[in-house]
């Protein structure tokens, strides 16, 4: 008896297909996705609707906090009081241009998928969540359950972390 497999499009491909109008022109539109992109979960001021999420969607970027550490993060930064070392290391050093970000709307759902297009920046004009990276949103305003996609696990509260999903699984 032979083993049979059903092939299905991945959740990321389905999101992109539903995004509507193609970005760029033709079938070879460059979405800016890197050759070996990591996939990141990003919380925009926590979960649910909020002013930071709305502003980020309108202006094509992601923002995180840890503002009390100031603009410059270095090896000398003392994380003993407020923590944040892992999140800030991910945002500044591990996340790369061309990586994919998924905006966490709840512990089980995402509301947007984008591609990182910029290096980390500090924006003092914001009262909170001053650390920013530019992104190109591929799809916004969705409400997709990704628990199955994320190995059966809900997302955690951490502001930024790499999802343990390969790009081939996502596509």
Please place each PLM-identified region on the residue numbering.
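C-terminal interaction surface of TIR/SEFIR-family domains
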Residues: 1-31, 145-171
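GIY-YIG nuclease signature motif recognition
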Residues: 42, 113-114
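Aromatic- and Lys/Arg-enriched surface recognition patch
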Residues: 1, 109, 115-165
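Compositionally biased, charged N-terminal/linker segments
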Residues: 20-90
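Short, well-ordered loop/turn sites that connect or cap secondary structure elements
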Residues: 94-96
């Amino acid at each position: 008896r032979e083993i049979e497999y059903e092939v299905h499009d991945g959740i990321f491909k389905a999101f992109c297909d539903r995004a509507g109008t193609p970005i760029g022109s033709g079938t070879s539109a460059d979405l800016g996705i890197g050759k070996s992109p990591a996939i990141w979960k990003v919380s925009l001021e926590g979960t649910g609707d909020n002013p930071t999420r709305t502003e980020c969607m309108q202006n094509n970027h992601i923002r995180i906090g840890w503002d009390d550490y100031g603009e410059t993060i270095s090896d000398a930064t003392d994380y003993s009081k407020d923590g944040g070392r892992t999140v800030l290391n991910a945002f500044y050093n591990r996340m790369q241009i061309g990586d994919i970000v998924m905006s966490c709307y709840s512990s089980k759902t995402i509301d947007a998928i984008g591609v990182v297009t910029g290096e980390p920046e500090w924006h003092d004009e914001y009262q909170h969540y001053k650390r920013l990276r530019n992104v190109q949103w591929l799809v916004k305003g969705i409400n997709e359950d990704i628990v199955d996609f994320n190995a059966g696990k809900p997302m955690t509260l951490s502001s930024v972390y790499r999802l343990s999903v390969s790009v081939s699984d996502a596509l």
